[in-house]
Design a protein with these regions (language model features):
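Conserved S-adenosyl-L-methionine
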Residues: 249-259
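ATP-dependent adenylate-handling active sites, centered on carboxylate activation for C-N bond formation
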Residues: 2-248, 262-275, 285-288, 294
Length: 297
């Protein structure tokens, strides 16, 4: 793609409206489905945007080319977390604002621990960062599938495209920023996308990611990298927030990023580390390669 070379994008203009329209078109394309669908709504910026756009199109009848309201089916949104987790509170606000039928799933730390063996089996890794994020999604997918929903939209990919991770604040210049987004995108299929796909597919649920839609990527990655940068105290993904600030509650549109596993509840990762350190001895780790000769921990 032409945008893989910084020289081809460094002088490009920045059109916020074009970005807005491109993402709406991407979500509309991803909604093409002959099975019941829903949206993953964590309460963060990315999933809130995809959910708001999905609701916009799901609320209209296709047969009338979007001119008449659709009375059925209603769009269902899903959020998971420990009780009183930050994500659950934020997701509730978004669902109320956009009008989805919202399902709030609570899980306990013990339920997460009980699912660990199955989660590791399905995601095929014991990397702690991947496991801690996969477990809530695995538990959520079970509930989604039990309701007969077979496809969900997710917000994966936005952080890689727009430099949403906090370390992007330290990018020394636009070229370094752009090249890091390219690096993150090139590795995405090995980590976040694979993790989400395996967690959902374990229960027969398909996940779709509008932020990684090919046509949308061409628009988003051709933006001048300077417009995506977040130096100093500027909040990450500012251009994306500006594009959809009218579609979301203000406190959501300008909410700072949290990791999914932190957003579902801070106690989850702390307990996971504690249980692991108590269950596995230093001697067992030293002999791990003998017991697990293929890809030892």
């Amino acid at each position: 793609r032409d945008w893989m070379d910084y020289a081809n994008v460094k002088d490009n203009p920045t059109d916020v409206q074009q970005l807005h329209d491109a993402l709406e078109a991407a979500v509309k394309r991803q909604l093409m489905s002959d099975v019941p669908y829903g949206v993953l709504l964590s309460g963060g910026l990315d999933s809130s945007i995809t959910s708001a756009i999905a609701k916009k199109y799901a609320a209209k009848r296709i047969e009338t080319n979007g001119k008449a309201d659709a009375w059925w089916p209603q769009l269902h949104s899903f959020a998971i977390g420990l009780k009183d987790a930050p994500d659950l509170i934020a997701a509730r606000k978004v669902a109320d604002a956009i009008g989805t039928v919202h399902h709030e799933i609570h899980y306990t730390i013990q339920e997460g621990l009980d699912a660990l063996r199955d989660v590791i089996y399905h995601i095929e890794t014991y990397d702690v960062t991947t496991v801690r994020a996969s477990t809530p999604m695995y538990l959520l997918a079970r509930v989604i599938r039990s309701m007969g929903i077979k496809m969900v939209l997710s917000g994966e990919g936005a952080d890689e495209v727009f430099g949403g991770y906090l370390y992007f604040h330290k990018a020394p210049n636009a070229q370094a920023f752009h090249e890091e987004t390219l690096r993150k995108l090139s590795k995405l299929y090995l980590y976040d996308c694979l993790r989400a796909n395996k967690s959902l597919c374990a229960w027969g649920v398909e996940g779709r990611v509008p932020f990684l839609d090919k046509e949308f990527l061409d628009v988003a990655m051709r933006l001048n990298p300077v417009a995506k940068m977040c130096p100093g105290t500027i909040i990450e993904k500012k251009i994306l927030r500006e594009a959809f600030s009218d579609s979301l509650p203000k406190e959501i549109a300008w909410r700072q990023k949290e990791q999914f596993s932190d957003g579902v509840g801070y106690g989850w990762i702390d307990t996971l580390k504690k249980i692991t350190s108590e269950s596995v001895t230093d001697k067992e780790m030293a002999n791990a390669a003998k017991r697990f000769p293929i890809n030892p921990p």
